[in-house]
A protein has these predicted regions:
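Long, distal/terminal scaffolding or interaction modules
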Residues: 26, 56-57, 127
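A membrane-cytosol interface segment of integral membrane proteins
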Residues: 2-6, 142-226
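Alpha-helical transmembrane spans
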Residues: 39-104, 226-227
Length: 227
């Protein structure tokens, strides 16, 4: 099903076609390519806002305790500044991970499959033919961005550790590949829906046809609104 290839991240410039492990075969059409938004990855995957808030609370607590114990505002400031520097480095590393994840990831939708090129140091390419995708779910944010979650057939499985962070959170037993943090999710959702339907037998197209499919319900599955 989902064959994958390995390469080192610095070899992306040697790709025969951007975001793909090989040039598309004759007759296969490229419909869409995109990458995650760096800021959304930082906030949603690496939880930068929550971590920053946690660090801020720790700093406030440390300042209050040192000032209470020593009675010196200067000592409290010095003690807190050292901790603040360490916390800033930690937040910077999280931001760097988000940046590298965004820059090394390319999602591709063709008329035959979805291809995910992911990985910072070790690059992996996953080919997901439409015949092996059971359904998909659109998770749209209020700003028009969002995620596309792909549900593979039960017999097909990609290890969660290989997919992360491009996997639906906490679906460990049956990992679901996820096109994350897309800036404008409606376009790839509509293209995915159309391509998936076109790849299905005529009886399946009729079963899931009018009414069940749309930008808000790609690949015949429900639509979840996220903030």
């Amino acid at each position: 099903m989902s064959s994958h290839r390995h390469s080192l991240g610095h070899e992306h410039e040697l790709e025969p076609q951007h975001g793909l492990p090989e040039t598309l075969p004759a007759g296969e059409r490229l419909l869409w390519q995109g990458s995650p938004q760096r800021l959304r990855l930082a906030l949603d995957v690496f939880h930068l806002r929550a971590v920053a808030l946690y660090f801020a609370l720790l700093l406030a607590l440390r300042f209050a305790l040192v000032q209470h114990d020593t009675g010196s505002l200067a000592e409290a400031l010095v003690s807190t500044s050292w901790a603040a520097a360490l916390f800033a480095v930690a937040l910077g590393l999280l931001w760097l991970l988000a940046d590298l994840s965004a820059r090394t990831t390319v999602y591709t939708i063709t008329d035959r499959r979805v291809v995910m090129r992911i990985g910072i140091v070790l690059s992996l390419s996953f080919n997901l033919p439409y015949a092996r995708i059971a359904s998909a779910e659109l998770r749209r944010r209020a700003d028009g961005g969002g995620d596309l979650v792909l549900d593979l057939l039960p017999e097909d499985k990609i290890a969660y550790v290989h997919l992360w962070p491009h996997a639906r959170p906490w679906r460990i037993s049956h990992p679901q590949p996820m096109l994350r943090a897309l800036a404008a999710v409606d376009q790839p959702a509509a293209l995915l829906t159309e391509a998936w339907l076109a790849a299905q037998p005529e009886t399946e197209r009729a079963r899931v046809g009018s009414g069940a499919i749309g930008v808000s319900q790609p690949v015949a599955l429900g639509h979840a609104q996220t903030a």
